[in-house]
């Protein structure tokens, strides 16, 4: 794979706030995520408006889908999302339904610049056998989260985190990594071959958002040539 991409998670409750947040760093990011809170508050309107405003960036709808997979996937993709998140806790049938919808969209529109894809959110209980099953379904992407408690406690990425990421990488799944990512963290993942993106939310909003985005891009350029 090429260089990892940089993704902003828009976790504001209101679209007006999210639009201000993304505007200040629009030239430094590759992926825009309609976060779960924003999607619940504003619905697919947020996806449609961001798609219209940013046609050249990858757009993620972070629904953390756990049920009604086919319906939610269709809603997100029709609104303009490129990727849809599905919870690792979702029933296998839900994951399969979401993947089927993505494949149907790609078949109907074979020349899409960014194919529709499913991302599995690695929250809660999951195991590597399940990851193999997802790959067999055709799902290529997953999102690895550092422990929320560890993040809030100011703890760094653990050896277990790195081991998990290395094993996921060896299976061939494309990983996005999140959980309080800072520029100083990026060197920990420089040997990850299938690294899709780094995701940051709070770090990229506010007065220092643009500066942090530039630092993250600089580190990506340093470690991935």
Curated annotation (Swiss-Prot):
Q: What is the catalytic activity of this protein?
A: 3-dehydro-L-gulonate 6-phosphate + H(+) = L-xylulose 5-phosphate + CO2
Question: Recorded E.C. number(s)?
Answer: 4.1.1.85
Q: Which cofactor does it need?
A: Mg(2+)
CDD domains cross-referenced by the UniProt entry: KGPDC_HPS
One GO molecular-function annotation for this sequence? metal ion binding
**Residues annotated for substrate binding in this entry:** 11, 202
Please cite one Gene Ontology biological process associated with this protein.
L-ascorbic acid catabolic process
Q: Note whether Lyase occurs among the keywords.
A: yes
Residues that bind Mg(2+): 33, 62
Transition state stabilizer, annotated site positions = 64, 67
On cofactor binding, the record's note says: Binds 1 Mg(2+) ion per subunit.
* Entry keyword set: Carbohydrate metabolism, Decarboxylase, Lyase, Magnesium, Metal-binding
Identify one Pfam family in the record.
Answer: OMPdecase
| Domain of life of the native organism | Bacteria
- What does this protein's UniProt record list under function? Catalyzes the decarboxylation of 3-keto-L-gulonate-6-P into L-xylulose-5-P.
UniProt cross-references to PANTHER family, sorted A to Z: 3-KETO-L-GULONATE-6-PHOSPHATE DECARBOXYLASE SGBH-RELATED
**Per the similarity annotation, which family is this?**
Belongs to the HPS/KGPDC family. KGPDC subfamily.
Q: How does it assemble?
A: Homodimer.
Q: What is this protein called?
A: Probable 3-keto-L-gulonate-6-phosphate decarboxylase
State the organism of origin: Haemophilus influenzae (strain ATCC 51907 / DSM 11121 / KW20 / Rd)
């Amino acid at each position: 794979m090429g260089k990892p991409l940089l993704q902003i998670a828009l976790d504001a409750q209101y679209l007006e706030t999210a639009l201000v947040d993304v505007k200040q760093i629009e030239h430094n990011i590759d992926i825009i995520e309609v976060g779960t809170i924003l999607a619940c508050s504003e619905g697919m309107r947020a996806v449609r408006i961001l798609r219209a405003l940013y046609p050249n960036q990858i757009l993620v709808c972070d629904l953390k889908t756990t049920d009604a997979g086919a319906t939610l996937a269709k809603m997100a993709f029709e609104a303009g999302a490129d990727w849809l998140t599905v919870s690792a806790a979702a029933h296998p049938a839900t994951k399969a339904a979401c993947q089927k919808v993505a494949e149907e969209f790609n078949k109907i529109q074979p020349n899409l610049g960014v194919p529709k894809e499913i991302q599995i959110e690695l929250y809660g209980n999951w195991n590597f056998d399940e990851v193999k099953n997802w790959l067999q379904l055709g799902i290529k992407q997953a999102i690895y989260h550092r422990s929320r408690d560890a993040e809030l406690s100011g703890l760094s990425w653990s050896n277990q985190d790195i081991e998990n990421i290395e094993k996921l990488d060896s299976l061939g799944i494309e990983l996005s990594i999140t959980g309080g990512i800072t520029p100083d963290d990026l060197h920990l993942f420089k040997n990850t071959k299938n690294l899709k993106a780094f995701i940051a939310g709070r770090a990229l909003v506010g007065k220092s958002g643009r500066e942090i985005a530039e630092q993250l891009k600089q580190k990506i350029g340093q470690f991935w040539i």
